[in-house]
UniProtKB/Swiss-Prot annotation:
The gene is rasl11b. Transmembrane segments: none annotated. This is Ras-like protein family member 11B. The lineage of its organism: Eukaryota, Metazoa, Chordata, Craniata, Vertebrata. Its EC number is 3.6.5.2. One of its GO terms (molecular function) is G protein activity. It comes from Danio rerio (Zebrafish). GTP binds at residues 30-37, 77-81, 142-145.
Length: 244
């Protein structure tokens, strides 16, 4: 895994560092403290780290194999979203992340009822942002291992995801890597099927087109060549007349 940046500006994957023919961009959104960063790090590194610094919106990258194809995955972590008297409160970074992404992971914690209640508004934000096209969205319920402090019933997640027409996964970032990997990997597979595949020789074709003017072409005869050829022809005629 590679941390591309931790600034609020979202940059494209540097082309020089990305030999893959496909780049998948995923934004992870949700309320504060639901475990977004833990999910991202768990998926990309298999590790779980319990303590994190305040989420500043890091952009992570990793190359993986999907159906035999090398794919570059960019995962944009985002600051937590809250609800205030005026509705959904999120930073410009969250909005830009959604607009930038090819797919979105919405996360809530089963221990936080408020994080579950704002999912509907988050889904509306995503669909409004991508009103011109439909992008893959999945709903992830995190912290499934904390049964003793559960505040969202197990049946509520699937019901909500069905209403929003998106896939649902209940996971524990701290205890089960396979659950987390399954959710993200399935999303990447579905997204890869939707994206047109770039031909392997596409880059080389462009390069060849750019280099084509460098191919040597026959030179037009200059004045020195013309004079030299004229003298050769003239000398040949003189020799012919002399021999006669």
């Amino acid at each position: 895994m590679r941390l591309i940046q931790n600034m609020s500006t979202i940059a494209e994957y540097p082309s020089a560092d990305c030999p893959s023919s496909r780049v998948i961009k995923i934004a992870v959104i949700g309320g504060s403290g639901v475990g977004k960063t833990a999910l991202v790090v768990r998926f990309l590194t298999k590790r779980f780290i319990g303590d994190y610094e305040r989420n500043v919106g890091n952009l992570y990258s990793r190359e993986v194999q999907i159906d035999g194809e090398q794919v570059a995955i960019q995962v944009q972590d985002t600051p937590g979203v809250q609800v205030n008297a005026n509705g959904l409160s999120c930073t410009d970074h969250v909005s830009r992340s959604i607009q930038w992404a090819d797919a979105v992971v919405m996360v809530y914690s089963v221990t936080d009822r408020k994080s579950f209640d704002l999912i509907g508004q988050l889904h509306q934000l995503v669909t409004r942002t991508h009103s011109d096209r439909s992008i893959p969205i999945i709903l992830v319920a995190n912290k499934a291992d904390l049964l003793h402090v559960r505040r969202v019933d197990a049946q509520e997640g699937p019901v909500l995801s069905s209403a929003l027409s998106c896939s649902f996964y209940e996971v524990s970032a701290s205890e089960d890597y396979n659950q987390v990997h399954s959710a993200f990997h399935r999303l990447c597979v579905d997204l890869a099927k939707l994206q047109p595949q770039t031909p392997i020789n596409a880059t080389s074709s462009v390069t060849e087109k750019k280099r084509s003017p460098l191919i040597p072409r026959p030179k037009s005869p200059n004045m020195q060549d013309l004079k030299r050829r004229f003298k050769q022809v003239l000398s040949a005629k003189v020799r012919t007349v002399t021999s006669v």
